[in-house]
Design a protein with these regions (language model features):
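Positively charged, low-complexity intrinsically disordered leader regions
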Residues: 2-40
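N-terminal Rossmann-like or analogous alpha/beta NTP/dinucleotide-binding catalytic cores
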Residues: 82-168
Length: 348
């Protein structure tokens, strides 16, 4: 069976009881092959695939290799909070496709997306373990964080999972969450979590977010037509339209890396896959009485027609907050200073 998510094809493909020759992507338990053998599984939403997630997944991969079996990362779509609390939409640190890419870079064999439906939400912990982990995935070991919960009303925890493992013959390894001194406040110790990173992004603290992620926070989107004002002012910008509910940094101007993610030809000097220095404005353009919140990237030292391109903006540092200027000339001068500042930061 073959399906797709996020524009990427998924296929069950052949399976073995050893590590697989290539990464497989499955959606739903129906795509788990009927002859699937034993495996190591780690479970979580993994939004952001931050350093805590990376340590968990790396440990699962190492365990799978030592046991000579594939490693499966099981995640969920949509975010469980959207189903448990209808109307809620946690800001998304990574798209599902980006999540898969980041997870696969860590050496896993299978990326399994379980549709988080109202029926799935109602699974008791006992059914969750028996029907999914034991009967379908044939787990030999489950690797989770120490705060892991599962099943209806999150009634299952690590202790219950261990008891189930004793009954069904699989091991459970729970890992301590990562805590470090804050990158921006040396007097504060923080525990890396998706919630913490969302709060950093929301506050515009992209340095702290990057410290927890292990890389700059990325916003992806398609370049759409704006009002063309940047070009008139001498700073033509790519207006990036991210997916709904993306985690967008606080209003302000940022130094960032800009990358076109597609592979087709582009009219101009921008090469797909190459990253370019950029000064990025997030906000409503108050100088011109704007109301719509936008992400506008001025890509340094390039000329290109980017309309319709799928791009990524990796936020490195906040240069200043959003300001309203009385004169357009004052804005233009500040944009020049922002560009110089971004270039200096990104050239280090």
């Amino acid at each position: 069976m073959v399906t797709s998510f996020g524009g990427i094809r998924l296929g069950a493909g052949p399976c073995t009881r050893r590590r697989l020759a290539f990464v497989q992507r499955w959606r739903g338990q129906d795509e788990i092959p009927t002859d699937w053998g034993r495996c190591v599984v780690t479970i979580g939403v993994f939004d952001g695939v931050h350093r805590g997630h990376q340590e968990l997944i790396n440990h699962a991969v190492k365990t799978g290799r030592s046991r000579g079996v594939p490693t499966v990362v099981m995640t969920f779509d949509p975010h469980p909070m959207e189903v448990v609390f209808p109307g809620s939409h946690p800001a998304q640190l990574t798209t599902l496709t980006r999540r898969a890419e980041l997870v696969e870079e860590l050496g896993v064999d299978v990326f399994l997306v379980m549709p988080f439906t109202s029926d799935f939400m109602k699974l008791t912990p006992e059914r969750y373990v028996h029907e999914l982990l034991v009967e379908r995935l044939h787990v030999v070991e489950v690797v989770v964080g120490e705060n892991f919960t599962f099943g209806k009303k999150a009634a299952g925890n690590v202790a219950l999972l261990r008891k189930a493992g004793e009954r069904f013959g699989f091991a459970v390894d729970s890992m301590t969450l990562i805590s470090e001194v804050s990158a921006t406040d040396r007097d504060e110790t923080v525990t890396f979590s998706s919630t913490y990173i969302r709060s950093c992004v929301d506050a515009g603290d992209v340095v702290a977010a990057a410290e927890a992620l292990g890389r700059p926070h990325r916003v992806e989107g398609v370049v759409v037509r704006g009002d063309g004002r940047g070009k008139v002012l001498g700073f033509p910008t790519a207006n990036v339209a991210p997916p709904m509910y993306s985690a967008i940094p606080a209003d302000g101007v940022y130094a960032a890396w800009f990358t076109v993610l597609g592979h087709g030809p582009i009219a101009g000097s921008v090469i797909p896959g190459e990253r370019y220095q950029a000064a990025v404005s997030v906000g409503t353009n108050p100088t011109f009485s704007g109301r719509t919140r936008t992400v506008e990237a001025f890509v340094l030292d390039t000329t290109a027609d980017l309309y319709g391109q799928h791009v990524a903006v990796d936020f490195v540092a906040k240069l200043r907050g959003q300001e309203k200027f009385d004169k357009v000339d004052d804005l233009v001068e500040q944009m020049g200073r922002d560009t110089d500042h971004a270039r200096t930061l990104l050239s280090r």
